[in-house]
Structure formats: structure tokens, C-alpha cells
Amino acid sequence: MKTSPRRPLILKRRRLPLPVQNAPSETSEEEPKRSPAQQESNQAEASKEVAESNSCKFPAGIKIINHPTMPNTQVVAIPNNANIHSIITALTAKGKESGSSGPNKFILISCGGAPTQPPGLRPQTQTSYDAKRTEVTLETLGPKPAARDVNLPRPPGALCEQKRETCADGEAAGCTINNSLSNIQWLRKMSSDGLGSRSIKQEMEEKENCHLEQRQVKVEEPSRPSASWQNSVSERPPYSYMAMIQFAINSTERKRMTLKDIYTWIEDHFPYFKHIAKPGWKNSIRHNLSLHDMFVRETSANGKVSFWTIHPSANRYLTLDQVFKPLDPGSPQLPEHLESQQKRPNPELRRNMTIKTELPLGARRKMKPLLPRVSSYLVPIQFPVNQSLVLQPSVKVPLPLAASLMSSELARHSKRVRIAPKVLLAEEGIAPLSSAGPGKEEKLLFGEGFSPLLPVQTIKEEEIQPGEEMPHLARPIKVESPPLEEWPSPAPSFKEESSHSWEDSSQSPTPRPKKSYSGLRSPTRCVSEMLVIQHRERRERSRSRRKQHLLPPCVDEPELLFSEGPSTSRWAAELPFPADSSDPASQLSYSQEVGGPFKTPIKETLPISSTPSKSVLPRTPESWRLTPPAKVGGLDFSPVQTSQGASDPLPDPLGLMDLSTTPLQSAPPLESPQRLLSSEPLDLISVPFGNSSPSDIDVPKPGSPEPQVSGLAANRSLTEGLVLDTMNDSLSKILLDISFPGLDEDPLGPDNINWSQFIPELQ
């Protein structure tokens, strides 16, 4: 702690006379330098003073000489056995007799065979006796000032005791004064100005020292228990101000004390507050006295003095001796030892406690960021969706309600990524959701003639787990269907084909240059494909949900036309690109409204490639133009009512047949898988014209039972596709990216299928 700025000055003032200890030796060195004339004059003056001293009834052996430099000042040499009080009385009387003209200052020095007092201090004091001041300056060589002897009547035994405590260096310096007056010539080195100013200052200091010594004499005995505090002045006592005030008040007999006495008691018992503490500790004492109710202020009878007492109900009569009382009564331990033991470790304990309390707090501050990591609910895990909740809407709940249920289920299980439920359309003939705009449609792989088999396939789809892929028997394919006049657009179909080929090459473990869609599989092949799909679906589930690929905004996505046949590019190149009669943005917004409330991009659009990965087989476009659109059996299966002017100039590249015809009649003979692949555009692209509107599903026209059956299957597959898409945020990508290894090398290819077993059912 910082020391008080004024305290070192007080200490210096007390030690100020100490450097004068070498004064006798210095004077002895200077004595030979004195001129003989000065010595003779001093001797003459001294002889006069001796005569005066005899007349003033001075005791024998006292020599008085005038000061060589200071006017009206005399030096009095006192023997060891002289009575100081009688000498002072005689000097006072002499000063009164001489008045202002005579000497009124006397410097007393001790003389004899041995130094009466150690060298060091030359304090001077001045005392007033009358209207005329007679200053008696007593100069000694001991640490005890002569002013104390003037102001405090002490017995000669005390003075002798002080004289016996002199240091031996005075003797070595030869400070013994002979009877010859020449031995006091060392006083010449003092100038009158310096000696006068020093005498005035030292007189004031000696008064202060006198009062301090009187106070120390009074409190010398009670301060004995706290003697050990002298060894630890730099350490603050381990007591509060309130406790120290109680110690001070309870130390008195009447249990009351003035504020000044409280200050004094604390300074005496705890030197820290006297030497080191800042002066503000007294303000703290006053603050505690007025703050605590246990301290009561009382006034004396005359109302001039106020005392502080402790309220009887709150007084525990704590004293400093009780605090330092030994714990073991059998061990007589001094209070000061206990005091030092109790005082010294406490600051260390306090520091240790602060360290112990601060370190856990710092550790807790560091651990705060780690706390959320421990919480298990923040770890991304795969939430298993209840199968009943997923499958029930596909069978019992209407489509809008199913969409709302799935969106709420998705929002509840995956809060980070929200993907709008999209309608997945299986490879069956269905009707669009509404006739107002193009929706997501389904396609027949081999024409409407296979519609009697579709209910069985739909049942198989419902048996599949909701998070799994559907097998090739009824693979759902998302297709954004444009209006009728936009259907033969060459560029979107080219993009669709290239995008699918990019998916196949990037996602499938084995590259497959061909895609063969066969709606009929043997039971063993269906089971094996289901196992493969389940295995891939589990592997996709095991991936982190954070691995999501950002898609471009939906505005930038082109309209997709479904055509995966290898001859589509050549077929589309021969067709003129018609004017687009519908806004792609409206179609996208419509598809988002159908899917759900979230505006998310369509996920089946992928980066396109300018080079198709499938070989284009030579095929004449004339085989596709078999019948014009006017021959479609009188049934309007167009999802959008378009103007006739937009649909008239379109040629018929799709080979639309009557509904009563079968794919075997319209398609060329299947000699090889290549021929089957090249005939895919016939089967797949003819589906949009075979899709019926909701009115056609509810009230089918006579002579066309197939659209009704396919429409029922489409309703079921629509909801099924919704369930599959809302299961996981990555399933919609799996539906397009899933690969089918072993498809090309299957011995049971499309050309090995016996189509005759299906002919009776189709008829």
C-alpha cells in the first residue's frame, strides 16, 4: 500500500538532529584553527561570566561564557553532578535582572570527566517568563532534548539514566570538556542566522515530541500486547473498522470514548494506520460510527464533549485481548504471537480465496460456449417418420389435406430445411390436378392398353416404405407438362434428355449409356430391384442432412419436357419450334401452389450438357406421323384448352392412335433392345394426350374404360408421390439420381418378354 506523503516528513523531522553526532569531532578539528586573539577574548569574557555566575548564586563548577557569534547569548557549561533545576532557576533570574540589554539566551552544555549525554541532538526551546522574553536554550549532546528537562520536571535519576545510555563514540571523539574555556570554541562554526532559525524550528519540534512522549508513557502498558504489530507495520490488520471501534470502546472502563481517543487507540494498537495507511481511514471510522446503529453518541453534562458508546443490547464486549486469546488453555501463548499469527496468514488466505473464487468463474465463462454442444437436441439426427402418418393420407385423406399434413410434419421434424411437397406421378395414366394450368402428369410406358395392370402396380407401390424408392415396376418421374402447343418444343426436350444423362453418369456407380423402361418385370427381378433400391435409400439416409446442394432460383429454371428416347434430339430437330403461348413463370408458380405453401425451386432441373450421352439411332420421322391429332377418338384429353390456331400448324410426330389400339399395333416390331429404346418416344410422349381432365375421370365417356382406371390409379399415385417427396429433404433428388445396376446385362431384356400373355387381358 502506498505510504502517506506526509508521514516520511514527520520521521525526518524526528531524525533531523541525528547527523549532528559528529559535531564534537568536527569541533575538535576546528579548534586548532582558532586564532590566539579570539581565544584570549573568549577567556576574558568567560572570566567575567564566572564572576557573574558567582554573584547570581550558581552552583560551583558552572562556567558561563558569551557566544562568539550570537548576540545576547551565553554558553553555560554544567558539570555532571550539578542540579539542573537550580541552574535553570538561576539563569532565569539572571535574564530578568539583565533585561533587554543583558543576555537572555543561554546554551547549556555538559562538561566533566565523561560525556554526560551522547552527541547528536541540539534541540532548543524557548520559554516565556515575563512580558520580556527570556529564552533559555539548552544544548546537549544526548538524544533526549534539554527542553524536556525544562518543561517536564524529572528527578535527577531519570537524567542520569539517560546519561548512562550514551554511545561510546562520544568518548572516542574526545568530547570531554576541560576546565579551560578554550574547549568550547567549536561553537564558532554556527552562524547566527542558521542557529536562530534552527532553534525556533527545533523548539516547536521539541514541544511536539514532549507531548508524544507523554502520550506514549500513558499508553505504554496497554500497548504491550500489540508489540508484534511493530514487526508487521506494512500489513493491514484483519479487522473491520466496526470491530476496531468496538475494541477501542470496550478497552475503557466506562465503555465510552471520544472520536479522537478512538483514532489514538487504533493508531497505537495498529501501527499500520499510523505510518502507512492513507489519512482517509479516519473518514471510514466516522462513517462506520454513523452508519451502524450499535454505536450511540452521547454528550457530556455541559454539552461540550461527545462520547461514542455501544448500545447495551448490541454490545458483545469484544476486546483485542479476547481476539488473541489462546485456543488451548494449556499452552501459555503470548497475545502478540497469536496476533501476528492471526494477522499474517489472513491476507494470504484472502488472496487464495479470491483466486479460488475467480478461477471457477473464469472457467465457467470459458465453458459457456460449450454448453449448447452438450445438448443432444441440437445434434442433427434422422427422425424416423411414423409409417401410419405417412401412408394414411395416401389412402384415406384427400390431396389438399394430405399436402397440409405433410407440410406440417416436415416443418415439425426438420426445421432447418423446408422443401415444398411436390406431387410425384407414377408411370400410370392420370388426370392433371386442375384444368386451369399444366400440372405434373404421369406417363404410360407402353400405352393405355396396359391400364388393367395398373391397380396391381399401385398396390405394390403402397407396400413400399415411404422413405424408399419405388421399383422400376412403377417408377415415379416428375415432369412439368407444358400446354399442348408447347409440347413438341425441341430445346426443352433436349435439355431434359441431357440433364437426365448427366444425372445418370454422376450418380450411378456404373455408367450406363442406355435407359430402358420396361413396365413388366418378372417377380424375382422386382424383388431384387427393391432390395437394391432399399440399400441405396439407407445409404442416402446415413449421409448428413447438411450436405445440400444449392439450386438456382426457380425463375431461372426452364420448362422441362419429358422425353428420354435416344431419337428425341433428331426427332425434335426436324420439328419447328412453336411460339410459347404460356408464361413459364406462371407454370412454375402454379406448380408451387400445387405442391405446398413453400416457394422452393424444382429439384429435377440439373446442369445441362450440350452433348447427349445416348447414341442417336437412325429412324425416319415419318413413322411417328401416322395420324393427325383430329383422329383422337372424339375425346379431348388436353389438360389446357388452347386456341385452335396454335394447335393446327403442329404436325403429328407422336403417332397418336385410337384408344382401342394397343402399343403392339402402333409400335414397330421389337427385334432388339435398341429398337425398344428407340420406340420410347412413341410410348412416353403419347401420354399427355391420353391424360384426361377431372371431369373425364368422374364421368367417363362410353367406350373408354381405360382412362377411368388409370385416373383412379393416378389419384393414389399422386398422394403416394407426395408422401415420398415430403419424407426427406434429399429424397426428391434420390428419385431422379437413383441408379439401376445390372439393367443392361439382364438376360430378361425387353425382347425376351413374352407379350402374348398380356394380349388376352388387353383385349
Curated annotation (Swiss-Prot):
Cross-link Glycyl lysine isopeptide (Lys-Gly) (interchain with G-Cter in SUMO2) mapped to chain: 163, 201, 325, 356, 422, 440
One of the record's GO molecular function terms: protein kinase binding
Phosphoserine: residues carrying this PTM: 331, 376, 489, 522, 693, 730, 739
One GO term of the biological process aspect: DNA repair
Domain of life: Eukaryota
UniProt feature, compositional bias: Polar residues: 36-45, 583-592
DNA-binding region (UniProt annotation): 235-327
Tissue-level expression: Expressed in thymus, testis, small intestine, colon followed by ovary. Appears to be expressed only in adult organs containing proliferating/cycling cells or in response to growth factors. Also expressed in epithelial cell lines derived from tumors. Not expressed in resting cells. Isoform 2 is highly expressed in testis.
Region (Disordered), start-end ranges: 1-53, 198-232, 329-351, 482-711
Record text on subunit structure and interactions: Interacts with PINT87aa which is encoded by the circular form of the long non-coding RNA LINC-PINT; the interaction inhibits FOXM1-mediated transcription of PHB2.
Function comment: Transcription factor regulating the expression of cell cycle genes essential for DNA replication and mitosis. Plays a role in the control of cell proliferation. Also plays a role in DNA break repair, participating in the DNA damage checkpoint response. Promotes transcription of PHB2.
Domain remark text: Within the protein there is a domain which acts as a transcriptional activator. Insertion of a splicing sequence within it inactivates this transcriptional activity, as it is the case for isoform 4.
Protein name: Forkhead box protein M1
Naturally occurring in which organism (per UniProt): Homo sapiens
Classification lineage: Eukaryota, Metazoa, Chordata, Craniata, Vertebrata
